[in-house]
UniProtKB/Swiss-Prot annotation:
One of its GO terms (cellular component) is membrane. It has antimicrobial activity against Gram-positive bacteria (A.globiformis VKM Ac-1112 (MIC=0.3 uM), and B.subtilis VKM B-501 (MIC=1.2 uM)), Gram-negative bacteria (E.coli DH5-alpha (MIC=2.5 uM), E.coli MH1 (MIC=6.0 uM), and P.aeruginosa PAO1 (MIC>40 uM)), and yeasts (P.pastoris GS115 (MIC=20 uM), and S.cerevisiae Y190 (MIC=20 uM)). Causes paralysis, but is not lethal when injected into insect (M.domestica) larvae. A second study reports antibacterial activity against E.coli (MIC=100 uM) and S.aureus (MIC=84 uM). Keywords: Amidation, Antibiotic, Antimicrobial, Fungicide, Membrane, Secreted, Signal, Target cell membrane, Target membrane, Toxin. Its main location: secreted. GO terms for biological process: defense response to bacterium; defense response to fungus; killing of cells of another organism. The lineage of its organism: Eukaryota, Metazoa, Ecdysozoa, Arthropoda, Chelicerata. It comes from Lachesana tarabaevi (Spider). A motif (Processing quadruplet motif) lies at residues 58-61. Expressed by the venom gland. Residues 23-61 form a propeptide. The modification Alanine amide is found at A81. Belongs to the cationic peptide 03 (latarcin) family. 03 subfamily. This is M-zodatoxin-Lt3a. Cleavage of the propeptide depends on the processing quadruplet motif (XXXR, with at least one of X being E).
Length: 82
């Protein structure tokens, strides 16, 4: 159950960050991805994040550790996107 809560918190954080730093819709229309390209990109991102490798000890459950992991994931996403 804790794993689901952590994953949900990460998804919410990513959505909030993406929404606050979103690009105008007009710019995205020119660079539309096909469904297969989008699926491949999402698979690559999930592999890069390696969410299934989260530690289940006390340290991993602390907020500081989760914040550190979130920063690492965001850096990976930024590198992947740009």
């Amino acid at each position: 159950m804790k794993t689901y809560a952590v994953l949900l918190a990460l998804v919410v954080a990513f959505v909030c960050i993406a929404e606050s730093t979103g690009y105008p819709v007009e710019d995205l229309e020119d660079d539309e991805l096909t469904e297969l390209e989008a699926e491949a990109l999402l698979e690559d991102l999930l592999e890069d994040l390696e969410l299934e490798d989260l530690d289940y000890n006390e340290e991993a459950r602390s907020w500081k550790s989760m914040a550190k992991k979130l920063k690492e994931y965001m850096e990976k996403l930024k590198q992947r996107a740009g």
